[in-house]
Amino acid sequence: MVVVTDVDLVVDFLNTVDHEAHTDVLSDPDAWRRWLTDRGLADSADARAVRTALRAAVGDPLEEAAGAAVPVTVELPAGGAPRLAATDVAGAVLAAASRLAVLGQWGRVKICPADDCRWAFYDRSRNHSRTWCSMQACGNREKARAWRSARR
């Protein structure tokens, strides 16, 4: 099983749809089962709705804003601090997103604005100004496109 941080879980879940490659892990039962198994999570009937809502929440222009609600619990381990817990992937992802929001890190989860990409990424820049999933790929391509357009 892969050790997954909240950032990894949220970003990996958002990227279960790849618009550039035209693939969707949720539509491939074997790939989805592997994805869940690698993270030690159970399936959820709400997975697609949660992904759509989260992608809209972080700025995917092609996803319509929608709410999503799934059950989570608050656990209080002996001698520990309260924590959100979930029994399936939808709850685990929303619990992870909630922890990011509480820590003030939710705004760092972004969607690449390149029309042919729309990959989710976590902005680790000091001033939260990263725009592209990768400056070497999408950023360079978009800047070159803008430069060519301006030269015409």
Question: What are the roles of these predicted feature ranges?
Answer:
Residues 123-130:
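Short linker/helix segments within small regulatory modules
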Residues 112, 133-134:
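Hydrophobic face of beta-strands forming the core of extended beta-sheets/solenoids
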